[in-house]
């Protein structure tokens, strides 16, 4: 009888453990060097990819998806069309089915943009949403909400394409994540004016460059965890790292490898 009770207790513990694990949201920040690629796995199982790194990074993502059993992407968000964000998107489209793509409403003359658009044309089942100026859309996957906002302007001047970056706010229970693409001063100011941007986890804008990341923006976000997509050849500015550390943020860099952050809806932790 005692043995039977122990077996039942163990089975119940395993069941409750699996149930708790199934309710976790996972966000993986991939080490792409000075390039962006993040994979969100919803508690209900949907897969959301934000950016796809460079062309080389796209190949790494395809290999990683095959290894980890990621057989489809429910939503792919391309924040803007710089080669270190869209460069690997064609490889993703060629390697797994992608149900939906959200991208900003401008075009770019580049090889990477052309390859991405060509790959999209070869994926007729992929629904494409273009967010033009002031556009906004929200997706819900089970208990998570993902709100995506477009830039407010149609012209930020010469060489200011980064300010067209889509921003993505992810909410699960009491926890919040903010993904900022390469938002520079003008776009960060828009986000500040739009309302509360406090978050538990922040993907630091524009690879942590001090000249392009405002202290006011970081202070308003006040994240518990931050990830910077930088590289040994082009590291984040120490001023940005120090600003974050001084507010108690646990700062992580792509130079240290992948980062996996988990939320149970009440708190976040590094896994």
Task: Give the residues covered by each predicted segment.
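Bacterial N-terminal signal peptides
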Residues: 8-16
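Non-globular, low-confidence helical/coil segments that flank catalytic cores
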Residues: 3, 19-271
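Bacterial N-terminal signal peptides that target proteins for export
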Residues: 1-8
């Amino acid at each position: 009888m005692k043995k039977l009770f122990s077996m039942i207790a163990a089975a119940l513990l395993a069941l409750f453990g699996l149930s708790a694990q199934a309710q976790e949201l996972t966000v993986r920040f991939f080490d792409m060097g000075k390039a962006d690629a993040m994979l969100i796995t919803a508690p209900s199982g949907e897969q959301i990819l934000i950016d796809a790194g460079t062309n080389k990074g796209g190949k790494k993502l395809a290999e990683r998806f095959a290894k980890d059993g990621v057989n489809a992407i429910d939503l792919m968000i391309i924040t803007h069309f710089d080669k270190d964000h869209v460069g690997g998107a064609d490889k993703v489209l060629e390697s797994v089915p992608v149900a939906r793509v959200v991208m900003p409403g401008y075009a770019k003359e580049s090889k990477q943009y052309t390859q991405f658009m060509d790959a999209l044309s070869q994926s007729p089942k992929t629904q494409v949403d273009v967010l033009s100026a002031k556009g906004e859309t929200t997706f819900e996957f089970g208990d998570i909400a993902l709100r995506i906002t477009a830039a407010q302007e149609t012209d930020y001047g010469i060489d200011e394409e980064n300010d067209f970056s889509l921003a993505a706010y992810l909410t699960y229970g009491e926890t919040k994540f903010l993904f900022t693409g390469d938002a520079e001063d003008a776009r960060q100011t828009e986000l500040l004016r739009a309302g509360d941007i406090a978050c538990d986890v922040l993907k630091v804008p524009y690879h942590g460059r001090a000249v392009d990341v405002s202290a006011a923006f970081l202070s308003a976000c006040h994240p518990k965890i931050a990830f910077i997509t930088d590289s040994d050849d082009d590291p984040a500015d120490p001023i940005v790292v120090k600003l974050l550390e001084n507010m108690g943020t646990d700062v992580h860099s792509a130079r240290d490898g992948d980062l996996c952050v988990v939320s149970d809806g009440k708190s976040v932790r590094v896994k």
